[in-house]
């Protein structure tokens, strides 16, 4: 994807996450996952635009005995300002997808806290760039 395509996808995901978190949907597990993928696309746009990096996945891999950094590594290295928020969104997204987290009555609260804190913090960082 190009930088512009990543930005377009990020904005699309941002709007979708808002809709998933309100009635009649209230699918907080998916809303949390989409919040994460919104920030992921801003991250990928940034890595491509500023460092010419296209991550191969979330986590590091090994190829011929050499460690290949993953997106999570690149965030810590190149975007330390949002690393904590990104990691929390990443973890929450994984829990939502693979552990069925956020399906119960507390799902709304978890979604709102992630949206209003970690997501808002990371999103504000990219808004400073006009994104």
Feature-to-residue mapping (PLM):
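Terminal alpha-helical segments
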Residues: 1-131
């Amino acid at each position: 994807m190009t930088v512009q395509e990543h930005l377009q996808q990020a904005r699309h995901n941002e709007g979708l996450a808002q809709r998933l978190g309100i009635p009649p949907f209230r699918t907080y597990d998916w809303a949390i996952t989409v919040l994460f993928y919104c920030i992921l696309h801003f991250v990928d746009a940034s890595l491509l635009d500023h460092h010419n990096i296209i991550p191969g996945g979330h986590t590091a891999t090994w190829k011929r005995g050499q460690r290949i950094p993953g997106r999570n590594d690149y965030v810590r290295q190149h975007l330390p300002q949002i690393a904590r928020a990104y990691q929390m969104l990443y973890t929450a997204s994984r829990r939502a997808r693979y552990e069925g987290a956020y399906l119960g009555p507390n799902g709304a609260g978890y979604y709102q806290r992630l949206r209003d804190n970690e997501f808002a913090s990371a999103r504000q960082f990219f808004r400073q760039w006009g994104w």
